[in-house]
Amino acid sequence: MTNTFELEHIGINTENAQEAEKLALLLSSIFNLKPRHGQKSEFAGDYFECMKSPFLGKNGHIAMKTPDLESAVEELKKKGLDFNMDTAAYDEEGKLKNIYLAGEFGGFAIHIMRK
């Protein structure tokens, strides 16, 4: 089966909370988006997540969403990709919610999540 993937958001690493807020406000202003505060990050609409401290990926992360996460993981494994199992998050029912691919792609980590 071939799974479908859509861009969920782009996470951008910053040095601290002040830089994250500054960048989120700038991106919100440029693209007419609503800024939003989060615990670990500041957001510019639904598209940009400005991390309050450096996280996975030299530059940040790219989040992709898919309707069938388990099937997508199996498809990507068959393509030779590995996963960072330390990042796997599960819902209350024990189903996988999201996980990062191992390594970086153009300086970005890639986060796969359930749509």
Identify the function of each model-found stretch.
Residues K58-A88:
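Mid-chain, well-packed structural core segment of small domains
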Residues N16, T66-D68, G103-F105:
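Non-catalytic surface loops within mature trypsin-like serine protease
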Residues M1-N3, L25, S29-G38, D46-K52, ...:
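Vicinal oxygen chelate
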Residues M1-E21, G57-M64:
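N-terminal beta-strand motif that seeds the catalytic metal site of vicinal oxygen chelate
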Residues K22-L23, S71:
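Short Gly/charged-rich anion-binding patches and loops
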